């Protein structure tokens, strides 16, 4: 049986629809910036050879990840961010495809 995807969200908090930025716009901008910064910090962490600098950036990366999650939770709480539930059969198919790919790429194939 094929289900349609169901949207998972909270009731949307109304915001003014003007040309000026509203609360939703500001939070969305912050979330986008945190996503970008987290990605940049992650890339940088792969490149550091200096242990002290690595630890400092790791700490900043962790803070950025937490801020990103808090912003996502805030947007979800106000109904400004939603996700869709996926059909369990499709999830199982994706999982099996992923497993096959991993097995094919493994240097320890039998």
From Swiss-Prot:
Please note every region of biased composition (Polar residues). Answer: 1-20
Q: Where is this region: Disordered?
A: 1-24
Which protein are we looking at?
Answer: Uncharacterized protein YusN
Organism whose genome encodes this protein:
Bacillus subtilis (strain 168)
Tell me the name of the encoding gene: yusN
């Amino acid at each position: 049986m094929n289900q349609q995807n169901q949207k998972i969200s909270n009731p949307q908090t109304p915001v003014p629809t003007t040309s000026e930025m509203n609360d939703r716009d500001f939070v969305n901008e912050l979330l986008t910036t945190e996503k970008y910064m987290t990605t940049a910090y992650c890339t940088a962490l792969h490149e550091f050879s200096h242990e002290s600098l690595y630890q400092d950036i790791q700490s900043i990366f962790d803070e950025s990840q937490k801020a990103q999650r808090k912003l996502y939770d805030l947007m979800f709480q106000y109904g400004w961010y939603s996700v869709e539930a996926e059909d369990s059969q499709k999830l199982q198919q994706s999982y099996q495809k992923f497993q096959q790919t991993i097995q094919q790429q493994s240097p320890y194939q039998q």
